[in-house]
């Protein structure tokens, strides 16, 4: 039970202090499966060295308080994007080539047993290889507090926000506001806040009608959303939700309405540990014909996506890899800021096939290639 000094010796010919003896007793107290006789001896020793054990505990606690309670993670990312667009006016193709470099830091600060503070700090640079222009930005992309009480999670501040029911098809970006998620196996999500449209690129459109701007909303809009979905780790996943974005002045001018209401649903199935299939659908309501947009076709009011996944590269596992193939139709008015825009090449108002391949050539390094047509 008594381990001595850890080097195989007990140094019986040397005197030890009561604190050294208390350390040995503390190690003995932490052991399990000791006999009744040994347990009685340990209890007597603990009573004898109670003051030293107490003082030793105070010293350890004091050291723990001095340990930095902020943990840092981060990444460095390079992207090359080649985008070829048909110019319908002169029947020519326009090629755009962009280099993007991103340095990201993500600190997490422990506040107490229930709350932590989180942030995401981005420093990025983008070079347009066609025009020679260069853009550099440094932003605090997220800053918020997160509370956990049992199976309830609360996020408040400039938070990450993803529509889980449809695997991020409607939205996967950020919002200034709050979100509460209840439950474990089946979850209920309630979210509300404000969306900075100029940065968020809400309802991204390429201008489907004469007179439209590149992005429908330029001012801050209010957002409310509710979703019910099951745990994403289950074999069969499902979810449904309702999202509302409201901006009276601009929406009134664009389509003679004051808000866009989006109903979203998603289904997924894991055939095995390596193969899974997901699908999602969203429909926008509350939109009228009129205003700058004129008559709005149904294709702009609904979105759908389906994707087949095989494995997936993991940064912690060198040599791991994965692939996917999917088809998406993203209506401008039924996607707020889709995950296929945030992590892929697709904007609102576009549809097509996408394939991708990911690979981890070494630990903590992942490469990914995506092609869309």
Label the model's feature ranges.
Residues 9-15, 79-95, 129-135, 148, ...:
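Outer-membrane beta-barrel pore domains
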Residues 50-73, 226, 231, 235-243, ...:
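Charged interaction patches that mediate protein-protein contacts
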Residues 15-18, 69, 75-78, 94-204, ...:
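Outer membrane beta-barrel
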Residues 198-228, 238-260, 265:
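Outer-membrane pore/translocation modules
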Residues 1-77, 84:
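N-terminal periplasmic/intermembrane-space "pro-region" immediately following the signal or transit peptide
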Residues 3, 34-39, 112, 233, ...:
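Short, structured coil/loop segments at alpha-helix boundaries
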Residues 93, 173-177, 208-209, 342-346:
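Short, low-complexity, polar/charged sequence segments that are solvent-exposed and flexible
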């Amino acid at each position: 039970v008594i381990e001595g000094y850890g080097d195989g010796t007990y140094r019986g010919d040397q005197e030890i202090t009561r604190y050294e003896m208390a350390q040995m007793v503390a190690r003995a107290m932490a052991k399990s499966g000791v006999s009744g006789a040994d347990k009685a001896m340990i209890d007597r020793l603990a009573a004898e060295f109670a003051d030293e054990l107490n003082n030793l505990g105070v010293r350890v606690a004091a050291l723990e308080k001095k340990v930095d309670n902020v943990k840092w993670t981060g990444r460095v990312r390079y992207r090359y994007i080649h985008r070829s667009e048909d110019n319908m006016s002169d029947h020519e193709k326009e090629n755009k080539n962009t280099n993007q470099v991103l340095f990201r830091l993500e600190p997490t600060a422990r506040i107490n047993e229930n709350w932590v503070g989180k942030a995401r700090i981005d420093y990025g640079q983008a070079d347009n290889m066609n025009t020679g222009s260069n853009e550099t930005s440094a932003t605090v992309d997220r800053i918020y507090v997160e509370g956990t009480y049992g199976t309830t999670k609360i996020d408040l501040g400039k938070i990450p926000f993803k529509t889980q029911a449809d695997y991020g098809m409607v939205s996967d970006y950020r919002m200034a506001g709050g979100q509460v998620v209840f439950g474990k196996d089946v979850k209920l999500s309630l979210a509300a806040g404000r969306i900075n449209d100029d940065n968020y690129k809400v309802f991204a459109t390429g201008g489907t009608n004469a007179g439209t701007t590149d992005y429908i909303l330029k001012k801050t809009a209010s957002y409310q959303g509710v979703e019910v979905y099951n745990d994403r780790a289950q074999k069969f996943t499902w979810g449904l939700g309702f999202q509302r974005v409201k901006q009276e002045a601009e929406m009134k001018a664009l389509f003679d309405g004051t808000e866009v209401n989006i109903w979203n649903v998603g289904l997924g199935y894991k055939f095995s540990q390596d193969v899974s299939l997901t699908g999602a659908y969203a429909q926008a309501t509350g939109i009228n014909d009129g205003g700058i947009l004129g008559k709005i076709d149904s294709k702009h009011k609904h979105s759908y996506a389906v994707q087949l996944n095989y494995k997936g590269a993991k940064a912690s596992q060198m040599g791991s890899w994965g692939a996917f193939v999917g088809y998406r139709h993203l209506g401008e008015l039924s996607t707020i800021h889709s995950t296929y825009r945030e992590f892929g090449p697709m904007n609102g108002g576009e549809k097509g096939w996408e394939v991708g391949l990911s690979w981890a050539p070494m630990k903590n390094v992942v490469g990914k290639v995506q092609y869309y047509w």
